[in-house]
Design a protein with these regions (language model features):
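N-terminal cationic and glycine-rich segments that engage phosphates or anionic surfaces
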Residues: 1-93
Length: 93
């Protein structure tokens, strides 16, 4: 499953001490786990399609956040968000 790939990428980010990558992977995993719990209560199971939806929404949130940082000329934060976008967008292909 796709979540397993993200978990593996999170472990690699931890080993590399890449806090930016670790942060975004953790966010994705937490959102997926919350959705998984909700679905289990309904007798359903979370799928890769659900995870792709989560990633898409997170990318949109990151884009909006990056635009805010660019408006106030905080390039360091904007660049970190660009890195996060690159990391998770590859899971949409």
């Amino acid at each position: 499953m796709l979540i397993d790939e993200i978990k593996k990428a999170n472990v690699e980010a931890m080993k590399a001490r890449d806090n930016t990558a670790k942060g975004i992977y953790s966010i994705i995993m937490n959102k997926y786990m919350l959705l998984s719990i909700e679905k289990k209560q309904k007798g359903e199971e979370a799928t890769d399609v659900d995870l792709i939806t989560i990633i898409s929404k997170t990318l949109k949130e990151l884009t909006e956040e990056k635009e805010s940082y660019l408006k106030v000329n905080n390039l360091e934060k904007a660049n970190a968000i660009t890195h996060q976008e690159e990391l998770i967008s590859k899971y949409l292909n």
